[in-house]
Swiss-Prot record:
GO terms for molecular function: ATP binding; ATP hydrolysis activity; DNA binding; DNA clamp loader activity. SMART domains: AAA. It comes from Dictyostelium discoideum. It comes from the Eukaryota. Keywords: ATP-binding, DNA replication, Nucleotide-binding, Nucleus. This is Probable replication factor C subunit 5.
Amino acid sequence: MEIDMADKTNKFKTDIERKQFESLPWVEKYRPKNLDDLIAHEDITQTITKLIDNNTLPHLLFYGPPGTGKTSTIQAIARKLYGDNYSRMVLELNASDDRGIDVVREQIKTFASSMFFFNTTVPYKLIILDEADSMTNIAQTALRRVIEKYTKTTRFCIVCNYVIKIIPALQSRCTRFRFSPLPTPPTEIRLKEIIEKENVKVDSKAMNAVLELGCGDMRKCLNILQSVSMSSIDNNITEEAIYKCTGYPMPSDIELMVDWLLNSDYEEAFQNISDLKKKKGLSLNDIIATLQKFVVQIDLDNVILCKLLSHLSDIEYNLSIGSSEKLQLGSLVGCFQLSRDDELLHN
């Protein structure tokens, strides 16, 4: 659905309010306000809408990768439920900041137990716990008791990236909905609407680069576009500008590295990749992440390919725990040399 910016800009009472809105980050400026503005997960919104219409809304658990619309969806649902009473009937907490048991005992319990006297047809309040996977296990256990005690007057929506970090006792008390990464076509349509409103020109290669780097994360896509547009002089965004601003290696750079890894000797491949890394300021972690997409396209025996991917995962893990990039670059070149030798023996 197209974003109607005319409705948003006409509601401002003063120029200050208008300027404040215009200066917002794009992720907040274009955050969906109602269910019709959401671009994906129609099955989830339809199910929850039906539950609301039947007055059978349970406690909710939204989980999935970041930037897929979890928080926006529950906020849109809350606006549908409460309208002008939103601020009085909804408590929003970011559990990554307030993650201890004191929050459960004080803020959550106080809000859940308080009476409400507003003119609303909805017989319950709503507590939204964002990034709840950051809560301690003790706090989650205490929250379980609060949910049990105040179910008649309060509904809870637990939002997290990793459902495995939510204790089973909490999971069993909620209806779970998984938010998958956003599909490319509707994401591209929404991004084109936004860049048109912002008077930014993005060529097709640059748009493909944003979608590739975003990996179904709308927040990441918008942050990339806004960052690059701010660094652009004429508001023209190119593929090269996207990769230069984000620090990710360009596909042409990765193709060059793959050629060195497969055809050059150890010393030459190591030196060439090391020089390219320094020249373009690339991270080996980003190189590994992008490299695996190219590796699966190489014509190698399946057993050898599996070993190569296993080596790449070991390198990625070693980097995550602080191992030397130079040492792991040597390991990267070495594992390709071994794969080449194995392929020769296999043939």
